[in-house]
Amino acid sequence: MFNEILKKVDWHGNVLSLSTGKIARNADGAVLASMGNTSVLCTVVFDKNTKKDMDFFPLGVYYREMAYAAGKIPGGFIKKEGKFSEYEVLVSRLIDRSIRPLFDSNFRNDTQIICTVMSYDPRYSPDILAIIGSSAALAISGIPIVKPIGAARVGIVNDEFILNPVIHDNTGVNELDLVVAATFDSVTMIEAQACEIDEEKMLAAIEFGYKSLKPVINAIEEIKSSIRKDIFEVTARPHLRYNDEILKHFSSDIKSALLLQTKNERNQQLQLIQQKVIDYFSSKANSEANDGDDILNIEKALDDAKSKIFRDLVLQNKTRIGNRAVDEIRPIICEAGLFNTVHGSALFTRGDTQSLATITLGSSTDEQIVEQLNKCERQNFLLDYIFLPYSVGEISPLRAASRREIGHGWLAKKAIQLVIPSKDVFPYTIRIVSEITQSDGSSSMATVCSASLSLMEAGVPIKTHVAGIAMGLVLGEGNKFEILSDISGCEDHLGDMDFKVASTKNGITALQLDIKVQGINLSMIESTFRQAKIGINHILNVMNNTISCPKSELSTYAPMVQTLEIQKEKIRDVIGLGGKVIKELCKTFDVEIDISENGEVKVWGNVGENVKKAVQSIENIVFVPQIGDIFDGEVVKVIESGAFIKYVTGRDGFVHISEINDTHIKDINAHVKLGDKVKVKIIGIDHKNRVKLTLRTDKEHCKNKNEQYNDITTTTGGVKKKIKIAPKEAAVISNRKYFD
């Protein structure tokens, strides 16, 4: 019944399986890609009617992780998959960026690719299989693509490159997490997060991944040849008939406009030129330029003319938009500490692109809980990228983060992640918000710079600055090409590449490559790295001139934290029955208290004195009471034979009527009342740890019983006091402060 075609490939020690013809047979292309027990179903469907009014390729890519793939039922009130997670959006973009350069430039048909994780094996990541499966599904769909691609992940283990490292063997991903997509002869996409890897080593890693893809691409070609589906025919776009005439009459005007230095000046001039071009063709006899479709074709032809003139400027004169040299960085202005009540802020302006970054420091309860198929983790570093419509002088509704915003924010986060201190060094949850207040290209890399500046201004102990730069490419005939540093929005649109590089002074922390051509070679990547390093060093110098090291103190508006380590068996004492003790502490001192399973206690609050008092109370709770210790207590209950005194939070002791004072007492109520503040001394502890107290706190009263204990001095909340304690029974192991 099924005409299944199955291809298995031995790929560097793993078996890659590609199957088609069994599942989703109504799709134009459907491939089940598997490795180990991870399987991803990739489907392609395209509209057979060409959209003539489209000036872009309407491609939609959707990656979906189904909970059943990992044997789970979705959490939450509604037990089914909801909106796409950030990770699903990021993988969708990864697939899109890998395959988009493959399509025929004249193909303008609605196309949808859906990748569904059907089965999940924790050893093998489904994102690589999704890219490979999408490439294979496209190859058999009948869509005109130039050539298929493969994809691979590269890690580093023991200073050696490893292909597709096992997910839960983190040693292969900690130093480098690189994804490369490529055809037989060129690279189409790169995505990387790295621990300050130098350019030479990064290039070698890209080459290693690129050269490993041959068996994958061969397998896709074999499946394609087995299917032999007719290729959908595309026609040349009708706007091409206007190109020569536009270049003949308007080249000089377009060139002058492109050389203007500011974005607004260029856009205004280009708008005037566009109207002149439309008027020119409208005035001609038998013109169709008043027709809506034909006006759109004229605009497309004008765009082609701008692209050709831009390319000629770069390749022939080494001059670019804004009259810059190919390696020239736009003017940079950095400012730190703009707002008093936020915990940290910085403004980074590069040409007509501007990012305003703000820092918020929070407690461990502010950490983001992220659920994926293979794990549920808490993230204490968050970065949000917000692209505001006024940044490009436009009006649009303010909605939830777009896929583009999620992708740009994630790239900036990966670039900065390396320098973020560990929780042991800096226990705060850190949230960075980058708002793009002005945009003319490279806003994600401006976010990297503003985020780094704001972290130092906030006093977060990062070890060094991270800077980002977007590199462009203009391809000429033969092997001729030029690399552009710090591309503007127009250069991104008219050029062939957007290669984002983030780095410290020591090495690369993140990469992202998008291209509009069929691929680029390793020589172009090497030239990009070399030129990007010069640009990044320049940017780092400007940033260091503004602020070169973290401030010594946090903002007075930031929360304060003090950490204690207590014995595990004392955790229940701090929490209390039904959480009574910890709730009382939080309410009394207006603090948050976080207790981990290993006995680490963090106390958070906005008022330092309250934090210190809460810590002192916790130390009192876990403190092992010893005979002779003196406390300030409160009468909580009075009975005929004596009174119960709360001598520390959560701890009561009993004072017999005979221990109220040295005289005989007939009526205890005449001497102590509920709520009285009294000074008490421990004079006995029975086998059930019940504490016997006295109000007669003279030293001689317990002189002999104290001899077995040592006098030590401890510091609690910055206040020294002498206590009696048996060293082996100490419950407070250590006390760390993160504020003065």
From Swiss-Prot:
Q: Residue ranges of the KH domain?
A: 559-618
One GO biological process this protein is involved in is: RNA processing
List cofactor names only.
Answer: Mg(2+)
- A single Gene Ontology CC term: cytosol
Origin: domain of life: Bacteria
Q: What PROSITE patterns does the entry give? A: KH_TYPE_1, S1
Q: Which HAMAP family match?
A: PNPase
Q: Which family does it belong to?
A: Belongs to the polyribonucleotide nucleotidyltransferase family.
| Name this polypeptide is given | Polyribonucleotide nucleotidyltransferase
Designated gene of the protein: pnp
